[in-house]
Design a protein with these regions (language model features):
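Feature marking well-ordered beta-strand scaffolds used for ligand recognition
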Residues: 1-107
Length: 107
């Protein structure tokens, strides 16, 4: 817990230096390989770069100070899905062949 608090303080300090203010944080259940975030209403859709087994995380951000992971989806073997868009009521996500080969030993 002490390490997490130190990391959050470091992030907050870095954000303030750049003119931003940290409002909330999610570690995405330990899968921090986020590549793109799209917000629609009270939800944030996070595309993962493909280092973890995840392709998409959905967070409830109705309370920005305390975002909550609602659902996470795994990518197919040998693929990554690092982009996400929302058009109307449709979520669109890419599915690309991984260029780095099959990863079988996720942390």
């Amino acid at each position: 817990m002490a390490t997490l608090m130190r990391d959050l303080k470091d992030m907050e300090a870095a954000a303030q230096i750049q003119g931003f203010r940290l409002i909330g944080h999610s570690d995405l259940n330990g899968y921090g390989d986020a590549m793109q975030v799209v917000k629609r209403g009270n939800y944030a859709y996070v595309a993962h770069v493909g280092v973890s087994p995840l392709r998409l995380s959905i967070l409830d951000v109705s309370d920005p100070a305390d975002p909550k992971v609602v659902k996470q989806f795994e990518h197919l073997p040998n693929t990554h899905n690092h982009k996400v868009q929302i058009v109307g009521n449709t979520l669109i996500q890419n599915s690309e062949k991984s260029h780095w080969g099959q990863v079988t030993d996720y942390p």
